[in-house]
């Protein structure tokens, strides 16, 4: 009986490792030259297939490009979409979140994202700001051009719920700001709180 239980545990462990590998290859995050570049698969959340108009970066920034191979892309300036910027001497820490809001059900999922940029010429030892500037900061030049065939979806401002959990699925109806229900966690390895970290040079 014990060998059977041990074999079953090994199979469950291998299945868990495969699920982790599948989901972690479903995300690519880069930040450089004051650009935040994120690519995801619509299956990044366990047992959920997201449509491009159901997933948002930060405070409601929609997918900027949908690729034929089922890849969603977000390309935004690091001071937009409510992305938090924390400058510490020679590095800048960017923090935001990815939010899924179902159109057909009261289902919501969130994932925290972080990215570290190394500053070539640091001017501040500690400063913190949150995005939503209306124009380029002084001295910042636009060095990235949008593709000609890229179609930018109009900005959508969904009602996002706040939570201390880094990653969870909520059954809260997002159409109402006052009605709140208790969050139900994702039944997978992604139950654990985590942040996606990426280190990049400017």
From Swiss-Prot:
Sequence intervals crossing the membrane: none
Chain spans, region Disordered: 157-183
Tissue expression remark: Expressed in oocytes in primary through antral-stage follicles. Expressed in liver and ovary.
One GO cellular component term noted in the UniProt record for this chain: extracellular region
Keywords, sorted A to Z: Secreted, Signal
InterPro entries: PLAC1_fam
Superkingdom of the organism of origin: Eukaryota
Subcellular location, record wording: Secreted
Annotated signal sequence range: 1-21
Keyword Signal: yes
Major site of localization recorded for this protein: secreted
The UniProt record lists the keyword Aminoacyl-tRNA synthetase: no
Gene Ontology process terms (BP): blastocyst development
Purpose: May be involved in cell differentiation.
Family classification: Belongs to the PLAC1 family.
Protein name: Oocyte-secreted protein 1
Organism: Mus musculus
Lineage: Eukaryota, Metazoa, Chordata, Craniata, Vertebrata
Gene: Oosp1
